Amino acid sequence: MDRNEGGDFPINTPNNINSSGGSYNNSMNNSSNNIGRDIGNNQSSRNLKPKPSQSNLKWIARDLKKKSVRKDSERKLKSSGVLKKKNTVMDFGEDDGGSGDDGNITEGLPISEGMDDLPSSSNSRGGSGNDEQKKQFPKEMNSPSSEYGTTSGGQRFDTLVDPDISLAEMEEKMRQHKVYQEQQQQQQQQQQQQKQKDKELSSQKKKPSSMQLSKKKHVAKEDSETLETIIGEEKKEVVFEVKPYFSHAILQATMAVFLIWNIFYFAYRAGWTMNRTDYITFSYSILFIIVEFISFLGSALHLNNFTNPCTFVLVVTLEQILAKRRKKHPTVMMYVCTYKEPPSIVSRTFRTAISMDYPSENLWIGLLDDSVNYRESRGWAHLQSVEKNFLYVLLQKAVYSVHNIRPPVTSQHEDPHGILNETSSKIESSTKEVIEAEVQWFIEYFLLNSWFGVGQEIPRDADDAERALIAKLRDDNFSPYRTFTKSESEKISNFTIDSLQSLWHGSAFFRPLIRSILLKKDYVRNFVSELNNQHRLRFLNTEALAMAQYQVLMMGRQELPWDEISSGNVRIDFDTCDGPIVSPKCTYLRRRKPPIPHNKAGNINNALFNESTKADYEFLGLLDADQQPHPDFLKRVLPYFYSDEGQDLAFVQTPQFFSNIYPVDDPLGHRNMEFYGPVMEGRSANNACPFVGTNAIFRRQPLYDIGGIMYNSVTEDMYTGMKLQVSGYKSWYHNEVLVVGTAPVDLKETLEQRKRWAQGAVEIFSLTPWGYIRGKLGWRKMLYNLDSCIYPFLSPTAFFYGASPLIMSIWTVPIVVKDPIIFILVGMIPVMVLPRVIQYMILRAKRPYEAGKSGPSLWVEATDLWRAEQTFFGFAGTYISSWREGSASIVKLLKARKISRHKLAMWNWKRDFVKKPVVCEVFRQTKLVNENDNAQESSGKHKAEQSFRTSNKESDTIKNSRLFLPNIILFVVNILAMMSAVLRFNCFQNDMWLLVVVAGFSFSTLWHLWSFIPMALRQSEKQWPYASSYHAHNIVLFLVLGFLVLLFVDVKVCIPRVG
């Protein structure tokens, strides 16, 4: 019987205080009756008063012996910490909240007489006297009165004197219990002292910054409960596992061999060079040693990323975590950033983002349109695509809620061959296609022609207030940088058809608002009804239209809390009305750019600080306009944030994957699998994953704490990731393809992109105090970030290697020695072979497989190793040209700030906040724009508000043709070097091995530049049809055959030796 209910108590319960019918009755009845009477004041139960029996006396001797043996065994187990039970008399110090449900302490004992009404265990838990019992319990157990059973009325049942033991035994047990408590206290004190020492040691190693201290203050909040406080588990919840996929011992041993062998190689080279008497050979050899040493440092710095190759494997899903913690799905804002992408690409990305598998009420999609002028047609197209996609999802959900199109489920005996199920699934898929077609058709018709059936409305005249509001809204100086008040929104919803048409033709940004009003009109439903009567529509009916009601809120501000990133905003919110159908909230945001717009960083910070508050969302996702997320993108990334109790995790990065690029058809190296594979995984294992600008989920608070996306660099993404690491935050990498994008396929756009990346690396390298970064992050993380910034400065080595074959073939200047065996053993193996062996071992290592993945992990192909070397030669000229732009931007910034480079770098990295803008919950009413601003905007002299000019392909080709020249020059130089080496091979027998090395060196350079030259000469907007990199193998074969022919044919073409 349930103890919470009234009724009989079972015999063997702790609430039944038993006594024997013999000599124990007189000593125990008083105490048991007193306790039973005191506790029974608040509760009631049936009395158990069995009649005394003389046979009960026979149990005493046997039961005393049995009970003493049982208690001794339990005492030993309990003192060793193996057994913790509350159903023994030994459990004096257990505190279970005053519960009477402590198990059986009277098993095998006779039933005493004279028992009063006893309380139920369920009602004794919540009594007011429980706290007093907890406080008085230890004292009463040590008091002499407890030994004789003269405890107070608030005493618990398990503190009663056991009638089966004597007074001396009770004293001995009390002494043992006291000793046990003292031992436990001593152990706890020792543990606390050890923890205090560990904290002091860790604080001495790394002192927390002021941002870390302030960050830990708002960690302990009511809404940030940990797993222990909710379900009472002591074991920490495991969300993911870090699994290494390559042996660290083998990897470190191979790197040690690489370093030691290179030291011997450079020592041998230096000794050989110092013994040269030829001035040309000596000078060239010194220069070659310097270039090789720089390459060695770059290789060692790059191999540092591979020291800890691990992959993160999720072991729980987001739903399981939220179910355990009893929490709801967090609110996520997904920002899609666009600048000059075509509206079709932006619309496709927005459609996939709004269709993600996530609760609609917790998902918010925002399109950040950073086009140059708000009057431009591109901005209107972006706004229309936002409305179209929002309405599409809303109508689709409404249709599915009205029509049940799920196929019937048949049992196996009814459909043993699966024919009925297969037919039902086909019917369901065809039905979904019809629904999507009908919804798409209606949206296109409704957006293009929203005035059908106007004659069905009853005409009425507009009043004076309506005309005044129309004139106010049509004022170009007042809209759309303004906020609608509640009264204005109500007036607009009640406008006449003539007023709505007047507003429709006044400004294109008011059309979404007018369409949301028109959709509620009766003639729209009548139009759909007519179509249904004519059998033109099957699923889209008036009931679905009634459920798919949405509202549009026009907001914009001329005065902004943070005016450095915007001088005015246009914001249009699409939200569903109160009803059963909920679609993700959508927002279109456009800013009026200030004189220094800060590009993408300013666009994101405007949305973060000026157009959102802390209560709006907890997590922030960033997507580029051409990156389409997987439906499970959020479900696969958000679990990482729940494994971080201290909220030190700032963001989780996912890889970039391009649908128009394949492993063998990637001549420009867009896949970059080496970086998105072991490099990112190795850094993530040390909590230092870089931010690549897109496909990442941020926690809003860390990004807000550092002042948003960083400025002073065109690669603001890498700068922001470094700033978060310096501020004490962690960043992880989830190697699963969850976002698919498109990459530039022509050489011109690729070179522009790589030049911008290299310029940003130069700016970050110049504005970073590396000593300060090393003190904050340590050597390893500092080298991670240095490797991301130093690669443009290694590009001159590629030019030197490219020009060396021609120099050596003309002047016959040796590299090391003329003996090929020594050159291969001492030079080729440490410099060229060992780094490739290390990379190949790591790149081709087998990754741990994770069940339930939504996308594949990036698998590194064999050609990716060659792509890394290919891009090193192919983009060398582009990287060198970025020095000038990066240095010029730094000099311009220093002149504008009137501060030294070191002071600017220290200020930029030490500050905890760029600026603290205060964002109001309610948007303020804007004022009229100043006449000076209007005149400046109309004149077109404002730099940030110039009209967008489409790119002129001819002018862009002429402007960027200088980026193609280094590749073409290197290609021609190496062709000449190979021809010279082939001809001299038959003339100078003493230099034959040197010429073989020269020919191989020049061939390697030509191989790396092979895919760039046709694209540079053709200037095509499409990808060069470069079928496979393995075509180079055929070229090697023909060259080897040519060498063999020259060896056996008696033809010698001698060229006089220069010098």
Curated annotation (Swiss-Prot):
Catalytic machinery residues: 370, 717
Bias (Basic residues) ranges: 204-219
Region (Disordered): 1-159, 174-220, 933-953
Entry keyword annotation includes Cell division: no
Keywords tagged on the record: Cellulose biosynthesis, Developmental protein, Glycosyltransferase, Membrane, Transferase, Transmembrane, Transmembrane helix
Bias (Polar residues): 40-57, 142-154
Pathway(s) served: Glycan metabolism; amoeba cellulose biosynthesis
Pfam family for this entry, one: Glyco_trans_2_3
Function summary: Catalytic subunit of cellulose synthase. It incorporates glucose from uridine 5'-diphosphate glucose (UDP-alpha-D-glucose) to cellulose (a (1->4)-beta-D-glucan), which is produced as an extracellular component for mechanical and chemical protection at the onset of the stalk formation, when the cells exhibit multicellular behavior during culmination.
Family: Belongs to the glycosyltransferase 2 family.
Protein name in UniProt: Cellulose synthase catalytic subunit A [UDP-forming]
Gene coding for it: dcsA
